[in-house]
Amino acid sequence: MPRAAKRSPGYRVQNRKHKRKPCKDCVAQGLPLTRDAKYPGPRCATHHREFRTARSSTSWETRILATYGITGDEYWQIYEFQGGRCYICQRANGKKKRLSVDHDHKTGIVRGLLCTMCNKYTLGWARDCIEFFKRAIEYLLNPPAVQVIGERIAPVEADKLSRT
């Protein structure tokens, strides 16, 4: 007799419906016991999602308090003060991913909230060097190529410019 025939039905194929318990949050709220808690947790999908969100927010608040010394309420005050956007690019609004807390690495002072691109690649790459940004402003206002060869439109951009 093959070994597979001797075994009992696999764990996954057993009917576990009888083992499911009602959601503990539904029971606590007095809701009808129609929603089962999915294995392995004690909550239905709706309450499990709420629990995960609450746990995520709590751990985030604990982390920013330990790392930057600001509370979740102070974070949201800064967020509102900045108009709900990254202070530098004004594009990112922190809805999909929370804005990063930016701080001065030399003094430790919290400066504001920035998107990942501005915090990591703009300020991080420049290493908080003010001269870097002065050169960048000068570069945008007075490009060196224009000084040397005059205004010349790149062929890749010529088609776009002629259509407008």
UniProtKB/Swiss-Prot annotation:
Q: Which domain of life is it from?
A: Viruses
Under InterPro entries, the record lists: Endonuclease_7 (IPR004211), Endonuclease_7_sf (IPR038563), His-Me_finger_sf (IPR044925)
Database matches in Pfam families: Endonuclease_7
Task: Supply the name of the protein.
Answer: Gene 59 protein
Q: What is the lineage of its organism?
A: Viruses, Duplodnaviria, Heunggongvirae, Uroviricota, Caudoviricetes
